[in-house]
């Protein structure tokens, strides 16, 4: 049975699934309020070092750069509508291939063209991040975001990080105004 996390909680993926080599991170959401405008949310991953900054601009994985330089992190494609049940976007991570100088994978979701469309996370419900053992399909951990983020246009859902020889999953749920640009700047992306 999957571990259910609350904001700030963490779990050792290594202890919960000792034989897992490849993790699948699923991110999902539903739009609850819309004025008819298209609603496009995008998942992205920042591969950061000890200083909390990306190792290079190519260590930012998203719909226009779907694979990390080491090949370990692969975005599975952009879902432009968020329709349907289950994961809206997925990222596959080969934990055995993540470069040693990458200390943390930060998973974020942003609203595309949020300002011009007057959209924010207050219009989004049922958001979640889950980690699945890709080798056997079993869900290891899940974080259901519950806070109302009525002004934020970007959200860090969670992180996979190294702790000694272990990989851990931390539930973050931190919102940001300023969308993708604000998140990218915070993580050292040159925009």
UniProtKB/Swiss-Prot annotation:
InterPro entries recorded: Stress/Tellurium_Resist, TerD
Record field: compositional bias (Basic and acidic residues): 77-88
- Would I find Protease among this entry's keywords? no
The source's superkingdom equals Bacteria
Keywords of this entry: Plasmid, Tellurium resistance
For the keyword ATP-binding, the answer is: no
Annotated GO biological process: response to tellurium ion
Region (Disordered) residue spans: 69-88
What does the record give as the function of this protein? Not known; seems to contribute to the tellurium resistance (Ter) mechanism.
The UniProt entry's sequence similarity note says:
Belongs to the CAPAB/TerDEXZ family.
Q: What is this protein called?
A: Tellurium resistance protein TerE
Q: Which organism is it from?
A: Alcaligenes sp
